[in-house]
Amino acid sequence: LRNMDYSTIYDEIEKNHNYNVKLPDGGIIQLMYRFNRTGTELISHRLGYYPSPSYELYQNDPELYDVDYIYGDILNKSVLPVIIRADYNRDPEESELHHPYSHITLGGYKNCRIPVDRPISPMKFVKFIMEHFYYVPSSQLEFNFEIEGIVAFEEHIAEKDINKSRIIV
């Protein structure tokens, strides 16, 4: 899906059902993890948030969204939809030579890889999206955040990324 316009990327993900959650406004959340054969070690993850490239749902039923402050920013015409991806690969040969083991990419910018100090759990990623893109305070999310501590990953950051601006999970 490289070098394609955003709506084509979104349509391919949607058409192939390559996502875990489709939000009421059409936004898509993708959570993909790969573990070793015994399921005890994380090998890689690819987490993504793809905002809807169209406001067709809103145009067909604006009252549905107007009453809900959660969608205020999402439906603002001056807001540009931005893909958020969080990738992790424990393989030092692939990761250290080209990019940090764990990083966040904003938009489709090839060289935008913001180092993250460790892999990101599904709960933390979904919470991040809901709090920062939908204005849903965690106190209003109906998740059991106590289980958030069950899935915790060890710090895994390359020496050369420690002095860079980075995100600490």
Where are these regions (language model features)?
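Short N-terminal edge-element motif at the start of the domain
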Residues: L1-L42
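An exposed acidic His-Trp-rich patch
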Residues: R37-S121
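Detector for Asparagine
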Residues: N3, N16-N20, N36, N60, ...
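Generic ordered-secondary-structure signal
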Residues: D5-Y6, E41-L42, S52, P81-I83, ...
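Generic structural motif recognizing short loop/turn segments at the entrances and edges of beta-strands
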Residues: H17, D25-G27, I43-H45, S78-I84, ...
